């Protein structure tokens, strides 16, 4: 267990929320309507169209996180399973990149101020 917590300490810390501009504005509830929004916390990933609750987080050898989640899409019933990869941005080490299971980048997020 110690190795996992050390990897997490050196890797990605989600104890504070990360988001794009609108994700951070809306982190405490819907403040502004936005077509594009990304908010990442230690428990969920929220976009303009869906909300995903994390079931499991696995730290990878490269320091990235692979997250399995249940997602609820706007206007749809029930939850769908999903997998995301969260890793540090190659351009800016303070930012994180969120990609879906297919490797499509959903967006880049920075720690909310």
Question: Language model features by range: what are they?
Answer:
Residues 21-22, 70-73, 99-104:
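Short, flexible beta-strand-to-coil junctions
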Residues 3, 17-18, 46, 65, ...:
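Processing junctions and N-termini across compartments
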Residues 3-11:
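Sec/Tat signal peptide C-region and signal peptidase I cleavage site
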């Amino acid at each position: 267990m110690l190795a996992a917590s050390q990897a997490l300490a050196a890797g990605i810390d989600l104890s504070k929320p990360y988001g794009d501009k609108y994700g951070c504005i809306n982190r405490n509830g819907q403040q502004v309507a936005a077509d594009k929004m990304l908010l990442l916390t230690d428990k969920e990933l929220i976009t303009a169209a869906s909300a995903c609750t994390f079931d499991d987080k696995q730290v990878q050898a490269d320091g990235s996180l692979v997250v399995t989640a249940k997602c609820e899409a706007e206007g749809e019933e029930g939850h769908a399973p999903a997998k995301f990869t969260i890793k540090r941005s190659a351009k800016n080490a303070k930012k994180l990149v969120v990609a879906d299971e297919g490797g499509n980048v959903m967006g880049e997020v920075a720690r909310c101020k």
